[in-house]
């Protein structure tokens, strides 16, 4: 559930966190493949690859990492061992108040792109993702909470994941 004060009459915002509940909305499927409307499927083999990747409860997903992406994290060294960390995961983790140890663990982990992913119906990934999403929504904004939650599932909860290539 999205806290009411975060929605404030804008029910469409709930769609920003709906992916973690696909089996609830569409219960009659064994495997789920999410593809954002702005993603490009160039070859049907990609769809088959995602379905294969999620076998045995694994999460099939791609990291936001590679030649087409700019550097996603930066460190500004102040002096000695003191530094300011700037990364998407770290920023959202601090804002969501998930704890400094978790935020540090996520700081330089390759960001996961939730625009395309696959999971089986009974994968433990759904429960992990939903639990983390509930935590991130308490203090974080709706935008970014779902992505942070899946990054937590992979890098903190150690959800079994099959990372797929960018192309």
State what each model feature region is.
Residues 1-167:
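Glycosyltransferase catalytic domains, chiefly GT-A lineage
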